[in-house]
Amino acid sequence: MNSKKTLFLLAAILIISFAQAQNIPTAFSKRDSAFFSKTYPYILPILGDKVHHAKIRLPYPMGVMFNALVGRQDLSLSDMALGFGRYSDPAPPNMIDVSDIIAFDDITAQTSTFNMRIDAWLLPFLNVYGIVGQTKKADISVNLLKPFPLEVNTEVSGTYVGYGVMTAGAVGPLFISLDVNRTYNYNPRLDDPAKVLIGGLRTGPVFRFKNNPDMNITLWTGAMYSHFNGETDGTIAALELAPNAPDNIENKLNDLHTWYNGLTPLEQILYKNIYEKLDNGLTELKEGVEDGYIRYSFNKQINDPWNMLVGAQWQINYRWQLRAEAQFLGDRTAGLFSLNYRFGIHGKNWFSKK
């Protein structure tokens, strides 16, 4: 079998997509029959005309999707270092390694984000896309266990951009899709964007409406993997951390002294250098709170990067789809809601001989 026939068969088999949840139709409407009697009208996907001549109804090759996601992500932090500086002093502060004395409890991020995704089917089984979005609200709660109890709650927002690729196929009545994307999340508190990698595997059946071939409902289940760059560096203003400063900073100084005085003599010798640096840093911060800031660096990680997901999509017609998905188990719980519009650019199908 030559390479052209191999590509054609592969394209004909692997046309079921998660994004459109199109299965190979067994019966055509009058409109489908009229559609197949004409030349394939769109420039994409490559090999689209061959699949069209095999009377397989492809989704519109391009789309715009609007997504809204709300969720919760649990994290863990390690290798913490702090520095105390003033904006009026251009010299960077000396960083204090506090990883030996600081212990965190739960770090939880509650997020609300919106994004737009633009995609195109390059091949009948290969989709590429770009993402741009905004985190409207991320409430982050950090509970410090030692050297003294401290609960920090902060709200951040930011923008992100990214790209992704998805491949899809069919096994009997089930579709299977593998989706991988990377996003770059920008926040004014961070020196560099946070890089997030997400991979998802989904499979499920497609239910068509006999009297309305344009419409279908797709159900799926699957798993998702999340990973991001662990090293984080940033700056936070003193007033943002302690809005009632300097009284709040004075209270933390007292907590620091209480913690140190409660150590054994051997522990006091061991942690004396760190204690004195923190004491001096907090004291300087209290005296210049309007101009002060805290420099920080740490490593963050997801303890359980895998989570389960279930979802459903209602294809109203070939152009419009509504989707919902729930992500659970692992360290992530989230709900995703989407509206998708499909379209195509008319022209000679790329690499078609006709």
Language model segments and positions:
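Short loop/turn motifs that connect adjacent beta-strands in outer-membrane beta-barrel proteins
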Residues: 23-24, 51-62, 120-125, 170-176, ...
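Transmembrane beta-strands of outer-membrane beta-barrel proteins
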Residues: 62-67, 128-130, 174-178, 199, ...
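Transmembrane beta-strands of outer-membrane beta-barrel pores
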Residues: 68-74, 132-138, 169-173, 180-188, ...
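Outer-membrane beta-barrel translocator domains and adjoining extracellular loop/strand segments
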Residues: 76-83, 140-147, 187-194, 231-238, ...
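Outer-membrane beta-barrel transmembrane domain signature
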Residues: 183-317
